[in-house]
Amino acid sequence: MNLAYDGSAFCGWQAQPNARTVQGCIEEAMRSLLREPSLSIVGCGRTDTAVNASYYVAHFDFDELDCADLRHRLNSILPKEISIFSIEAVKEDFHARFGARRREYRYYIHTAKDSFKRSYSHLYTYNLDIEAMNRAAGMLVGTHDFSCFEKLGADNKTSICTVFEAGWIEYEPEIPGEGKYYCFHISADRFLRNMVRAIVGTLLDLGRGKRPQESIPALLESHSRCAAGESVPGHALFLSKVDY
């Protein structure tokens, strides 16, 4: 199952009691349509409250069904914030989470007030040295312990991740406004909870001169969340690609 969702209306992907989640909404709809009260779906990863996905993969086990019809019926009853792109049969050993080899996130910022970007981009009004930010982002590439960017109290077995690429680009929005528009993209084999937002916050500090770019290697070695920058808001973050 390939889908997208606007995370602003949900408390993240993962189903949880007394909270509106993407997984919970989809499972409720599918259980009703397929008359399977115990049906569950497995997602390619967990996204936090307000975080979006422009491309997301999930799987579920079912013997036989009309995939096109199920997609149509799901889209007709799911909240407007969730769109199902496709449903197709896969091999029995396919696993949406453990089979994923590469995930990509994008984070958007704009430097001047923009009514059309406010819902999916972070307003950051400081002048930024993008070249310095890109040099620092390049220092994240490779296999490292990223615990300095991990949410405190997380229960991961390991904080080791391999980052394949990371960097900033300036882009022109469809409806131009004042200021500049930037997108940070990062791909890795896995991500820790809050990792991307903490990295972005740290690079923004660096871009406005609050920390030197040479501090990144020492920051990784510190394993201290307190040494990194503050996490940026979740509404401007998108899971954008998953490779298998």
Task: Name what the model sees in each region.
Residues M1-Y244:
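Structured-RNA-binding interfaces characteristic of tRNA pseudouridine synthases
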